[in-house]
């Protein structure tokens, strides 16, 4: 069962509190729902599972294509690249691509 965000409830919460809101378990939500959540007060989104899925999916693919691989340096580079792509997509989805200026 896929998660479904209740943006109507989020709007109600946002109108009543003045604190940054966190979406725990943001993995597997539709991009449209995540974008709407960001537009309605969500400031932090936990997406560890989305990153892990990209990692282990690519590890499996690499190992299936190269059954003789045993060394992490043979297996992990493409998996790490897959993780990076997910992170880049999520940064844009969360409208956080301009936030680095606050940290450097």
PLM region spans:
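Alpha-helix-loop-beta-strand connector modules within alpha/beta enzyme cores
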Residues: 2-23
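Alpha-helical scaffolding segments of alpha/beta enzyme cores, especially the outer helices
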Residues: 8-12, 36, 85, 89
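Active-site mouth loops of central-metabolism enzymes
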Residues: 22-24, 76-77
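Active-site beta-loop-alpha junctions enriched in small/polar residues
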Residues: 24-28, 48-50
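Catalytic cores of alpha/beta
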Residues: 26-42
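Short active-site-adjacent structural elements
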Residues: 30-33, 53-58, 62
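Glycine-rich phosphate-binding active-site loops on the catalytic face of alpha/beta enzymes
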Residues: 40-56
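Extended, intrinsically disordered, low-complexity segments
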Residues: 62-104
């Amino acid at each position: 069962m896929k998660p479904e965000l209740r943006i109507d409830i989020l709007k109600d919460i946002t109108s009543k509190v003045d604190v940054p809101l966190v979406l725990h378990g943001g993995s597997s939500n539709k991009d449209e729902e995540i974008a709407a959540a960001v537009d309605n007060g969500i400031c932090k989104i936990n997406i560890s599972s989305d990153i892990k899925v990209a990692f282990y999916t690519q590890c499996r693919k690499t190992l299936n294509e190269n059954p003789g691989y045993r060394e992490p340096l043979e297996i992990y580079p493409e998996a790490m690249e897959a993780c990076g792509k997910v992170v880049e997509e999520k940064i844009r989805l969360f409208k956080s691509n301009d936030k680095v200026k606050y940290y450097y």
